[in-house]
């Protein structure tokens, strides 16, 4: 079953973060009940993946100013049929940043999500409002690369870690950034 790895990942995340059980259970319910949960056509929501992207030294983070949503967000997007959410996060980060050399910030063999979130996406054009069931990872960029803005954004920018509250106005982005800051302070992330 192609969704079993994600269900296992959600179970491990839920066990490690019992305070986030409600969100983990919402995503699990979608994956268990919707055959097409990895397709953007799945309504009322579908699986997405995203990445908090750090500079090689961990002192800065990269956000995109999303064209449709008009706000600063982490890089990420639709699974488009791919059940491997870690691969989706990596693919989307590469596409949206122009950075080819990225790696997961964990020493473990298997990428571990740092956060889960279910958030509402407003209707846009012919697309109805729907939920993104987002699995979030931390990536680190190799040194010496130049960022390139994609057509999905109006801006792409590196920010100092202490500027998080000045830049982000979305609660889920703030929560994600604060989690990463705590992990950096605890030296729990592997940088370049």
Where are the model-predicted features located?
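Residue-level signal for pocket-adjacent positions within structured domains
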Residues: 33, 42, 67, 74, ...
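Aromatic- and glycine-enriched beta-alpha-beta binding-site module
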Residues: 60-94
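N-terminal strand-loop-strand
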Residues: 39-74
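Acidic, metal-coordinating catalytic segment for phosphate/diphosphate chemistry
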Residues: 14-50
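Charged phosphate-binding loop/patch that engages nucleotide di/tri-phosphates or the phosphate backbone
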Residues: 171-192
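Predominantly extracellular/luminal regions of secreted and cell-surface proteins
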Residues: 1-26, 97
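Short glycine-rich, low-complexity/disordered patches
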Residues: 20-24, 137, 190-192
């Amino acid at each position: 079953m192609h969704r079993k790895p994600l269900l296992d990942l959600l179970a491990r995340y839920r066990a490690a973060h019992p305070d986030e059980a409600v969100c983990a259970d919402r995503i699990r319910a979608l994956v268990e009940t919707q055959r097409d949960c990895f397709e953007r056509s799945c309504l009322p929501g579908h699986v997405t993946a995203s990445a908090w992207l750090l500079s090689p030294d961990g002192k800065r983070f990269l956000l995109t100013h999303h064209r449709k949503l008009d706000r600063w967000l982490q890089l990420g997007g639709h699974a488009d049929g791919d059940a491997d959410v870690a691969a989706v996060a990596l693919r989307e980060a590469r596409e949206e940043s122009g950075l080819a050399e990225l790696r997961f910030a964990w020493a473990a063999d298997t990428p571990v999500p740092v956060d889960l979130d279910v958030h509402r996406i407003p209707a846009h054009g012919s697309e109805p409002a729907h939920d993104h069931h987002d699995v979030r990872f931390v990536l680190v960029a190799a040194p010496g690369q130049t960022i390139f803005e994609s057509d999905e954004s109006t801006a792409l920018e590196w920010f100092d870690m202490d500027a998080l509250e000045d830049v982000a106005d979305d609660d889920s982005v703030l929560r994600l950034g604060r989690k990463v800051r705590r992990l950096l302070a605890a030296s729990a992330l592997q940088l370049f």
